[in-house]
Structure formats: structure tokens, C-alpha cells
């Protein structure tokens, strides 16, 4: 059995286990063999865990054969696993294989894309689209031409030869190149000479646009002919519309200045017609005359005493003469007449309807408090 070849410490551990389980001679012997085998593999794992940290990074040297770890002794030497006489014979091949595998993977990841062959690089270029616009491709083709001019077929040929991506499908990018040639102002069409045999016109770069192409990149945004023509039409319309607008703007002050007096006159007419219409209406005249007569009768009734009546009569007659004398002075504008239409009738103390009808315009500019009349001369709104 394998227990004969075990060290003394393993035998003592096995005997101690045998003493703890006294179940029978046969069961004890089987348990001892099982424990001996278990302790053997346990010691192998222990040695492996203690031995692994002893290896440094420098020990993992790259092998000569990158596939050596597949054909190493861990695969071919299977007898070391079957026979347990040398426990280190099983673990050493695994270390060799692990070292070789790690070195291979580290060397693989550290390199660049140099592992790709030339054929694989060409295949990659066929898949990846070049980072150039169609206008940039056309410009590169024309600039690399000896005479700085190419036909459409020659542009196709240059793009297909220098960029393998466009060799797969020709329909899509050829249409795009034709559209860019016709819509971009930087490409000019040059007619073919009579002595030059062949078909199709030449295409050249505009001298003003040569600086716009820098290493295949177009520096500014292309403008279409339709956009440029529409912009020119807008500018022409704007230039034509500016003098017309200026003329209208110049005439507007001259039109407003004569019309402003007319508007003022119309407003004055509106303001003046309202008092004139009120004074000319007989109904309102009769109303105001009746109100003044009621005022005079009420004043006479309230002041029935002799002295008070005389004073009131003197005041009324004096004020009546004052108002009749002051009426002759046209001091108040007619615009303030409409503001006093809502005043009550007790503000006026005229004694006769003749004065009311004759000097009705002054009636709206006077008011009386306690039978005293004051003229509102120079009043402003």
C-alpha cells in the first residue's frame, strides 16, 4: 500500500485516526488507507500553495515554441499521476505548463497589430471606410494628376485603386462623386480639345479653392448652386426694396406733418361742435332757463326776511352786473366747456332767461357757492 512509503508524521496521524475510531479491524484498516491517501493529496496541495509564491516575474520567460504548453509533460506524462511514489512528479508539469501559457498570453497582448499579415491588413482596409468625403477624394485625384485635370472615369479609377473599400460596390459611390462634381463650385468643367481623342470633359479645381483642401479634408462647407442663386436673388430683391422703403420712409414725415393739423382741426371741431350743438338745441335752453327760474324762486322763499332779502337782491344784482361785464372778456377756451356739463343747476344764479341764452357759453365757466359767482378764467385741464 501507499502507506508504507509515507513519512513518520503521516503515519502517526493515521494511527491517531485509527485509535479514535475503534469500529473493527477491517473498517479501521480501510479508514487508515483512505486517510493516508487523503493526507498525501493534501500535502501535495500544500506544497503547491507554498511553492507558487517563490516564482518571480523574471522566471516566466517566453518559450521558444508558443504551442509548447499544449504538448508539455502535463499532457504526455500521465504515469506520474497514476503512480503516487513521487508526489512532486504530478505537480511539476502543471507548473511548467502554467508558466508557458502565461508567458505566451502576456507576450501576445503586449505587441501591436504587427501580428497581422499583409493580406489581413488589406482585408481590413477593404472593410473599413476611409475617413474622407467624396469632395476630398475628387480633390486628391485631381491634385495627384500630372496635368491637374481628370475625366470622370479617371477619377473613378483613382478612387478604386487607392481605396480598396470602394472596389466592392461601385454604383453608390460613383453616383455620389457625380453629384459632388456637379454641385460643388470648386470643381470646374473644362471642355476637351479637338486634338484630344476620347469622350467626356475634364474636371479641374478652381484656383480659389485649392487652399481649402488640406490632406484630404475640406476646410469649409460646400455651397450648392441653388443656394447661391437663391441668396443672390434675395440680395437683389433687398437692394431693389431698400430705395422704395427709403422713399416711403422719407415721405412719411411730409405726409404726417400736413395731416397732423388736419387731425388737430378735426379734434377741435369735435370739441367745439359739442358745446355749439348743446347751445343751439332749444330743449336744453328751456331746461336751463326753467332750472334758473326754480333757483331764483327758492332763494326768494328762503330769504323772505326784509334785510336778508335786500342783501340778497343787492348781491344778485351786483353779481349780475359783474357777470354781465365780465362776460365781454373772452378769456376761456371752448375746450373746457364740455367739462362743466355735469355740474348741477344750483351752480348758476342767473335771474333772466335772456342772459342765459345770450351768454350761455360763459354759463359753463362759472359756479356759485352760497349765491356767490366766480368766473373760472384761465382754467386748464
From Swiss-Prot:
Keywords: DNA-binding, Nucleus, Transcription, Transcription regulation. Residues 1-25, 214-278 are annotated as: Disordered. The keyword Hydrolase does not apply. Detected at stage 14 (late gastrula) in a horseshoe-shaped ring surrounding the neural plate. In neurula stage embryos, expressed in the neuroectoderm and pre-somitogenic mesoderm with expression in the outer rim of the neural crest and neural plate at stage 17. Subsequently expressed at different levels in a subset of placodes, excluding the otic and posterior lateral line placodes. In tailbud stages, expressed in neural crest cells that originate from the rhombencephalon and migrate to the ventral part to form the hyoid and anterior branchial arches. The lineage of its organism: Eukaryota, Metazoa, Chordata, Craniata, Vertebrata. It comes from Xenopus laevis. PANTHER family: FORKHEAD BOX PROTEIN (PTHR11829), FORKHEAD BOX PROTEIN I3 (PTHR11829:SF310). Residues 129-223 bind DNA. This is Forkhead box protein I1c. It is found in: Nucleus. GO terms for molecular function: DNA-binding transcription factor activity, RNA polymerase II-specific; RNA polymerase II cis-regulatory region sequence-specific DNA binding; sequence-specific DNA binding. GO terms for biological process: anatomical structure morphogenesis; cell differentiation; positive regulation of DNA-templated transcription; regulation of transcription by RNA polymerase II.
